[in-house]
Amino acid sequence: MQTAYWVVVMMMMVWVTAPVSEGGKLSDVIWGLVPDDLTPQIILQILNASRHAYRRVRPRGQICIWKVCPPLPQWIHPLVKR
């Protein structure tokens, strides 16, 4: 896994430095990696929406491992009739 990490890091370095070596500016290369419609407001909306969606599905004390969560106890479902 550590080797794969360094391979990705080296590929990113080549991907960023190759256009710079051809006379491009580093800031232009970095801005080229960012989508045109991505703004700080959209980033905050995405982060806020995902945080609230997670809390609606799972209570705060629930522990999930690798995105696998145990089933909710019956007392958490108020609409379930026994």
From Swiss-Prot:
Disulfide links within the chain: C64-C69
Listed transmembrane segments: none
Residue numbers bearing the 4-hydroxyproline modification: P70, P71, P73
GO molecular function: toxin activity
GO cellular component: extracellular region
Localization per record: Secreted
Top-level division of the source organism's lineage: Eukaryota
Propeptide: 23-60, 74-82
Annotated positions of the D-tryptophan modification: W66
Role summary: Moderately activates human somatostatin receptors (SSTR) with a preferential activation of SSTR1 and SSTR4. In vivo, does not cause behavioral changes in mice within a few minutes of intracranial injection, but causes a progressive loss of movement thereafter. Four to five hours after injection, mice recover, even with the highest dose tested. Shows antinociception and antihyperalgesia activities in two mouse models of acute pain, most probably by acting outside the central nervous system.
Family label: Belongs to the conotoxin C superfamily. Consomatin family.
Other known facts: This peptide is an evolutionarily optimized stable analog of somatostatin. In addition, it adopts nearly identical conformations as in the somatostatin drug analog Octreotide. As this drug, it contains a D-Trp at the same position, whose synthesis is a common strategy used for enhancing the metabolic stability of compounds in drug design. Consomatins evolved by gene duplication of a 'Somatostatin and related peptides (SSRP)' gene expressed in the snail neuroendocrine system.
Entry remark concerning the domains of this protein: The cysteine framework is C-C.
Protein name: Consomatin Ar1
Organism: Conus arenatus
Taxonomic lineage from the root: Eukaryota, Metazoa, Spiralia, Lophotrochozoa, Mollusca
